Design a protein with these regions (language model features):
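FIC/Doc superfamily catalytic core
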Residues: 1-282
Length: 282
């Protein structure tokens, strides 16, 4: 049985709609989250479909672990390097930022050269295949990641797009469609951005939630909050890639932007669905 959106039930009758919402929200299977979207407390239910998908992820990850263990070390390192380059090119491409594989390869060949554009982004992605741990616990941690990834690049492009608050932006920001229509307004004011990011980070670090789920939830919440003027997508994708590379096979983290780009319509539709007020935080 398909999990019907509350927004679909809304048009079938107010009584049925409210009853279904209350049943879901108060269900023993409901995980209620300490954060609200459009004034509704967020929650989710682990449906059979979601459980099956999570199981399939783990099965595929075991197969990937086995395959990579059988590849000679040098060949595997070369393949990881190729995947790293592809991920950086694609995460930029999604945002309309031009970068070439040649540029990224040159940075990888000389990581000490701090003068090249994209150096911060490349160096940060190298963490996916290293033992170094990155703290993602506080607003300051998120800001540090942004600084390492994108500060130099955005400063070079337009200093007005750099964050002007304690951690994030002070003013409003709109998310535009390809037709320049406003499809989402980032959270305001600065105090609310800081509060919601703290709540989102608490969810990300909640050990009672399955790791892949909390990574996905945080990815959505980051996009909803939209804490920066520029660089939100690339910062969010890096965080998700890094966390996936630590929870699953390293190569999984290098496939996120490809998966998003290949399913971009479905990806944006997912954001729109959760943003919809009639879905009441489901």
């Amino acid at each position: 049985m398909n999990y019907e959106l509350l927004s679909s039930l809304y048009y079938k009758g107010k009584k049925e709609y409210e009853q279904e919402y209350n049943d879901r929200f108060n269900s023993i299977a409901s995980k209620r989250l300490n954060i609200s979207i459009e004034e509704n407390q967020c929650f989710y239910i682990l449906t059979e479909e979601v459980v099956n998908k999570l199981y399939n992820v783990m099965v595929l990850n075991q197969k990937l672990d086995k395959l990579t263990s059988e590849i000679p070390g040098i060949a595997l390192q070369q393949y990881i390097k190729k995947c790293l380059i592809d991920e950086i090119v694609l995460t930029n491409e999604i945002e309309g930022v031009v970068s070439t594989r040649k540029d990224i390869n040159e940075i990888l060949e000389n990581v000490e050269d701090k003068n090249k554009r994209l150096t911060g982004l490349v160096n940060k992605y190298l963490n996916l295949c290293s033992e170094e741990n990155i703290d993602i616990i506080t607003c300051n941690d998120v800001r540090n990641i942004y600084n390492d990834l994108l500060w130099e690049e955005i400063s070079e492009d337009d200093k007005l797009n750099l964050p002007d608050g304690v951690y994030f932006r002070k003013e409003g920001v709109d998310v535009l469609s390809s037709f320049k229509n406003v499809i989402h307004k980032g959270v305001m004011p600065e105090e609310k951005i800081n509060l919601m990011m703290t709540q989102a980070l608490n969810i990300l670090n909640d050990r009672d939630i399955i790791p892949i789920l909390r990574i996905a939830i945080f990815h959505y919440l980051f996009g909803y909050i939209h804490p920066f003027y520029d660089g939100n997508g690339r910062t969010s994708r890096f965080i998700s890639s890094y966390l996936l590379s630590k929870e699953l096979n390293t190569l999984t983290g290098f496939g996120l932007s490809y998966a998003i780009k290949e399913n971009i319509s479905q990806y944006y539709k997912g954001f729109k669905t959760v943003n919809e007020k009639k879905n009441k935080g489901d």
